Amino acid sequence: MKQNRIVLGVAALVAAVMLPWPALGQEVGQQTVPDKESPAEKESEKPADKAAEHQASDKKTDGDWGFRWDGRPSLHLGEGTRVDFRVRLQSEIWHSDATLSLDDDSDADNDLSADVARRRIGIEGEILNIFDYQVERELTANRDPWRDVYLNYKQYGFAEVMAGKFKVPFSLDENTSSTNLDFVNRSRIATLLAPGRDVGVMVHGRFLPRGILRYELGLFNEDGSNAERNDTDYVHGDRTVAGRLLVQPFRSRKSVANDLAAGVSFTTSELPEGVSGLRGRTELDEWFYRPEVLVNGRRQRIGVEARWRPGPFSVKSEFIRLTDERLGESIEGTDLSPFLGQGWYVSGTWAVTGEKKAEGLDAPLRPLFRGPFFKGWIGAVELAARAERIRFGSVDSEISGAVPSTAPRAEIVLGNSDRAYTFGVNWYANRWIKIQLNLVRNTIGFPDQGPNPEQSSFWSRIVRFQFSM
């Protein structure tokens, strides 16, 4: 309830800042860093997206007012102030060789299933060239319907300030918008170990020539939406400090390496005493690890990431390690080895139709139905592959004489793991329509904890249909 009040307060502040001031946009708010990127949540949004959407805006006369089409409906309220209206629809069809129980009332196994994954509406834009803002709501969510609700002060590119509800600055994959993902689902480490969204405040910006060094540092109410559970018996991190540092050493050069980036990130949280909410699920939300481990102390994350997008290709990789302390949780009241979740992924893509990955494939070179005489082609086609692994257990997994156990106060926690290989094809018909097909091979370390105790490896097939404007 408190979080909802904060979110609604930020939304009201956005409206209050916008309405009285549109005529002043001609005189204030010039950015100090001309090539700076948008806020942290849009870290992975392609430069071509912004350029294409606001090409008309660059050509307008000073103080232009009214509705226009900038790739989506947009209301302009003078120079430097606009409201873009956004709609995002995503539906999925899937089938798995494993025994699925997404519908507890269903008696049929391995049936083809379908769902509307996202139905979101929202607004975003600028105010006087010195603020960015976004307000987005999920139409079908009964719990936590507000997604991104923030205001970002961007007048000084080396020290911008964002406040509201947005994604904690941790993990490249988690901070990539769902409309821009290379696969239907994020990696397991991003989904299960990264924080996700929370209410907080963050300072971020770029340093050094051409902004080759980027930082993000924030303070958040809790440990993020990914860590929350409906059952209040499970605990997650309270007040959280998070930071991320990203370097692009060749950003100022016109070379194939100018997009190469590497970064590190961390979070640290107070962790109240209770049962850890850390769990293991497959991409189809089937449990493969549900421990009842008592924790107490601090929750800490470290992450390492790298990305390179030369021409039509891309390569991305991450490593994430999360630990929950277990202070005083033994039967004798002594400390136990921290509870651990960690993993990695490596992924690659190839735009076979020739588009440059760093500039975005949602603006195909020859989109389907491009003009009034249909001089388009098939759009953009992309091949993708990803290998990943996530595992859970204790930090000290080899203590002499200790036997792994599922007991809440076990000295060594019995863990589990999931190794997955994903193969995908992405079709970008035009800037609004995208279809993704994924074939996934999962291998559960201890299948008796997974969706099918008699089957350690299984295939899943997923198709996503997306409309985004």
Regions found by a protein language model. Name each.
Residues 26-28, 33-53, 75, 158-161, ...:
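Glycine/serine-rich loop-strand microenvironments at binding/catalytic pocket rims
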Residues 18-20, 96, 173, 326:
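N-terminal low-complexity, intrinsically disordered patches enriched in charged
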Residues 46-47, 56-62, 99, 108, ...:
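Outer-membrane beta-barrel pore domains
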Residues 9-20:
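Bacterial N-terminal signal peptides
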Residues 21-90, 97-102, 212, 356-370, ...:
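N-terminal periplasmic/intermembrane-space "pro-region" immediately following the signal or transit peptide
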Residues 1-10:
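Bacterial N-terminal signal peptides that target proteins for export
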Residues 71-272, 340-375, 380-397:
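Outer membrane beta-barrel
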